[in-house]
Curated annotation (Swiss-Prot):
It comes from the Bacteria. HAMAP family: MutS (MF_00096). The keyword DNA repair applies. NCBIfam families: mutS1 (TIGR01070), PRK05399.1 (NF003810). Keywords: ATP-binding, DNA damage, DNA repair, DNA-binding, Nucleotide-binding. Belongs to the DNA mismatch repair MutS family. InterPro entries: DNA_mismatch_repair_MutS, DNA_mismatch_repair_MutS-lik_N, DNA_mismatch_repair_MutS/MSH, DNA_mismatch_repair_MutS_C, DNA_mismatch_repair_MutS_clamp, DNA_mismatch_repair_MutS_core, DNA_mismatch_repair_MutS_N, DNA_mismatch_repair_MutS_sf. This is DNA mismatch repair protein MutS. One of its GO terms (biological process) is mismatch repair. SMART domains: MUTSac (SM00534), MUTSd (SM00533). This protein is involved in the repair of mismatches in DNA. It is possible that it carries out the mismatch recognition step. This protein has a weak ATPase activity.
Length: 878
């Protein structure tokens, strides 16, 4: 605050209310700043008439982010102009969604009374914050991604131990877990892709949301920077407060039934998350489902690099859905099913019975096309039960929401009847839809009109015959409206004025309009209210009485309809849990029917799954995404056999030319294993697969500029992660290990990594490389074999056959690839000369073949290093 304040101007409006004497602001701005003080971490949108306006620094931010015009408004005689921007009230959801997507919290301060009443009493209209929108607490369909969960996460940490809770408040799902090692926490966060992550801290600026990439000393450096982090007070995350909140919320005396009684960090994270939901949802009570506890090793572990490299839900190139595994497999009919499929693919099963239950259902639907098609047709008529139930439970659902849910509930009976034909586990689960849900649906449909309006306080919601008082009020109102409709005719007859009209506006209500030239003919009971250029407007005592009656009756009618509707909505909310239970069964059968559809049209087979470890035996396997992109018949299928205990190699050295399909083959094997453990059929002729605990991939690398790591360092970090976590039950897919450094360094590392995987870990491994020297490993280790991707050499070109066959390749055809890419002919010629000299001088293959495998790399590397400088001079002609 300054002694001589500088007035804000149109060009330089006030942007920081904290520097001003707030007593000199207008009453509206005083209230605005009071509200803003309570929501400092949010952008405040403040209802003024038909607009939501924002002021000061919020206006600057919103104008920039939404590309709106920054203008100004008078803030007081001694304040001057204040920075302002605004959005129309009918476009609020669209603009608020854009702000939330950019990582901002948005507080909606709306009018909570009729502005006309406040104006009549000559006071400021009452306003309150009715919504606080943050990235992780959205419930409105218009702001949510339909086909994926919108998770809110919370973390509690002590040194390297951590608890992680996550919830989707739009569906009510609520989970928690506890583990150690912050790298594993990062992996789990990257799987969940939460929209917002809560971090307890003692920082003074709590309640602020840190947007993606925004640095903070309060965020552990091991955690991904791609999320919004909200700094929260430590208090709700204390064990005592968090546990009590969970016990109170779920009305239990112990957390044993939820599986987290002995997991203090999991409890703290879950309790802190619940407190945040309560804080942001204001008067709306979000119906969260009972907490479920899980472990990181309860499912097949896929780290972030594996999910990325296998392109499970988005492509590596541009992050798009098209071209991902999810794109290739998603034939679901409901948004619930689409979300479930996404979760299944990111958390494949380890439980053989669970996998086989899904396979059994797919197989039954595969062999019964009529049942499959009838199910899919009926599923298309079912709305998003999970999210509709969430909004109904939170008392934010519209009449359309409630009607949509009810229409879906009555269709569940048809779904159950169809499921009676089935014998597999997931079809049986649908045969037992609770009959009270059908009755609930019929009850709602008997109360709410078929196409209700969006707004629930404007009437026309409730059917006739539901409430006698409502019917009487409607009839009375209809009679009065009919009197108004007849008034124009009767008054024309009485006065003889043919162009007399009945009109209405907000300022004067109903009136009788006469041309000014006929005003002398106005009857004595006409009371003049307004004179215009070409007309005179009148009222009569009877018209005024009818008007008062009509307006009062309409308001009373709307209020009664609203009360009846809220009773109906509350009745539905009481059945939230059984509805959600059925919704899970519906989503699951939707996923399985869709997977059966894919299996039929893409020619998939049911893999034989076994708990006995160590076997991958795939006949004529195909890449599920690439084959759909190429079209039927164009993809070249290949076999894969791994598992030394089953007379196959544990590790395959895969060589072949650039662009021949090695990386595609690696991904193909990984995706087939993942799909099989999801319970899906797979793109192959036949397959027998052991259940694996983890899939690791290292396919390609780029510099990590954010952390200052080179391509080679990124590659080494990823490789170290694999070697430190892989087990004999894992599947490891490696592509081009060691290529980011000097040739001999890279070869030495590639050799030792392959040797370690085959000898120490004995994981099922495919090791794609251009280091043909690695083919020598097969002569040294009995569980290693060489395979190659073949080509056909012609005089002027090479043809990629994309066939994986036994034996090692002795050429990479890199120079040919360069020629095909258009390198100058002189460069190609010189490259061939250099290659000839390299092949002439390099003796590493001979050394590897003759030496002891435990010592050969050290001696050979030393010898090569000693000759390196001389060789380089010879090679390049110096």
């Amino acid at each position: 605050m300054t002694d001589t304040p500088i007035l804000g101007t149109v060009k330089e409006p006030q942007r920081d209310y904290r520097t001003l004497d707030r007593q000199k602001l207008t009453p509206m701005f005083q209230h605005y700043t009071e509200v803003k003080e309570q929501y400092q971490g949010a952008l405040l949108l403040y209802r003024v008439g038909d607009f939501f306006e924002c002021f000061f620094q919020d206006a600057v931010i919103i104008a920039r982010e939404l590309e709106l015009i920054l203008t100004s408004k008078e803030g007081g005689k001694e304040i001057g102009r204040v920075a302002m921007t605004g959005v129309p009230h009918h476009a609020l959801d669209r603009y608020a969604r854009q702000l939330v997507e950019k990582g901002y919290a948005v507080a909606i301060c709306d009018q909570v009374e009729d502005a006309a009443e406040a104006q009549a009493e000559k006071r400021m209209v009452e306003r309150q914050v009715t919504k606080l929108l943050t990235p992780g607490t959205l419930t409105d369909d218009s702001m949510l991604p339909a086909k994926r969960n919108n998770f809110l996460a919370a973390i509690a940490m002590v040194e390297d131990k951590w608890g992680l809770a996550h919830a989707d408040i739009s569906t009510g799902e609520f989970f928690t877990c506890q583990s150690s090692n912050l790298d594993d926490l990062a992996v789990e966060l990257l799987r969940l892709q939460p929209s917002e992550v809560l971090i307890p801290t003692s920082a003074p600026d709590i309640r602020n949301i840190l947007r993606p990439g925004e640095p903070s000393e309060h965020i552990p450096k091991q955690l991904p920077t791609s999320f919004c982090y909200s700094l929260r007070s430590q208090a709700p995350f204390s064990l005592v407060e968090a546990k009590q909140r969970l016990l109170t919320t779920f009305r239990v005396k112990s957390l044993e039934g939820m599986g987290c009684e002995g997991l203090p960090l999991a409890i703290r994270a879950a309790g802190g998350l619940l407190e945040y939901i309560e804080d942001t949802q204001k008067a709306h009570v979000v119906p969260i489902q009972p907490l479920k506890t899980y472990g990181l090793t309860d499912f097949l572990v896929l780290d972030h690099q594996t999910r990325r490299n296998l392109e499970i839900n988005q492509t590596v190139r541009d992050g798009s859905f098209h071209g991902s595994l999810l794109w290739a497999l998603d034939r679901t009919s409901t948004t619930m099913g689409s979300r479930a499929l996404r979760r299944w693919l990111l958390q494949p099963l380890l439980d053989l019975k669970g996998i086989q239950a899904r396979q059994d259902t797919i197989q039954e639907l595969y062999h019964h096309p009529a049942l499959r098609q009838d199910l899919r047709q009926l599923l298309r008529q079912i709305y998003d039960l999970e999210r509709l139930t969430g909004r109904i439970g939170a008392n934010t659902a519209s009449a359309r929401d409630v009607y949509g849910l009810a229409s879906s509930l009555v269709r569940l009976t048809d779904l159950a009847e169809l499921a009676q034909e089935g014998h597999s586990p997931y079809l049986k689960a649908l045969q037992t839809v609770p009959p009270e849900l059908e009755e609930l649906g019929k009850y709602v449909l008997a109360h709410i009109v078929e196409n209700p309006p969006l707004h629930i306080r404007e009437g026309n919601l409730i059917r006739s015959g539901v409430n006698p008082t409502l019917d009487e009020m409607r009839q009375s109102l209809e009679d009065d409206n009919q009197w108004l409709a007849n008034l124009e005719v009767t008054e024309r007859e009485k006065t003889g004025i043919a162009n007399l009209k009945v009109g209405y506006n907000k300022a004067f209500g109903y009136y009788l309009s006469l041309p000014r030239s006929k005003s002398e003919q106005a009857p004595d009971n006409y009371i003049r209210k307004q004179t215009l250029v070409n007309e005179e407007r009148y009222i009569t005592p009877e018209l005024k009485e009818r008007e008062t009656r009509i307006l009062t009756a309409q308001a009373d009618l709307n209020q009664l309809e609203y009360e009846i509707f809220t009773e109906v909505r509350a009745t539905v909310a009481e059945k939230a849990q059984p509805i959600r239970d059925v919704a899970k069964a519906v989503a699951a059968i939707d996923v399985l029917a869709g997977l059966a559809e894919v299996a039929v049209y893409q020619g998939y087979c049911r893999p034989i799954m076994q708990m006995e470890p160590g076997l991958i035996d795939i006949e004529a396997g195909r890449h599920p995404v690439v084959e759909q992109s190429l079209g039927a018949g164009f993809f070249v299928a290949n076999d894969t056999q791994l598992g030394h205990d089953h007379w196959h190699p544990d590790l395959v050295i895969l060589t072949g030319p650039n662009a021949s399909g090695k990386s595609c083959y690696l991904r193909q094997v990984g995706l087939i294993q993942l799909m099989a453990q999801t319970g899906s059929f797979i793109p192959a002729k036949t397959a027998t697969l052991s259940i694996c605990d983890r899939i690791f991939t290292r396919v390609g690398a780029v510099d990590d500029l954010a952390t200052g790591q080179s391509t080679f360092m990124v590659e080494m970090n990823e490789t170290a992660n694999i070697l430190n976590h892989a087990t004999a039950k894992s599947l490891v897919l490696l592509d081009e290990i060691g290529r980011g450094t000097a040739t001999f360094d890279g070869l030495a590392i590639a050799w030792s990594v392959a040797e370690y995987l085959a000898g120490e870990i004995q994981a099922r491994t495919i090791f794609a490389t251009h280091y043909h020297e690695l083919n020598e490993l097969a002569s040294l280790l009995e569980n290693v074999a060489n395979f190659q991707v073949t080509v056909k050499e012609l005089p002027e070109e090479i043809i990629f056959l994309h066939q994986v066959t036994p034996g090692g390749a002795d050429k990479s055809y890199g120079i040919e690839a360069g020629r095909l890419a258009g390198l100058p002919s002189s460069v190609i010629t010189r490259a061939r000369q250099v290659m000839a000299q390299i092949e002439k001088h390099s003796k590493i293959a001979v050394g590897l073949r003759k030496g002891n495998r435990g010592k050969v790399m050290a001696s050979q590397a030393a010898a090569e290093a000693a000759e390196d400088q001389a060789k380089q001079l010879d090679i390049f002609g110096f």
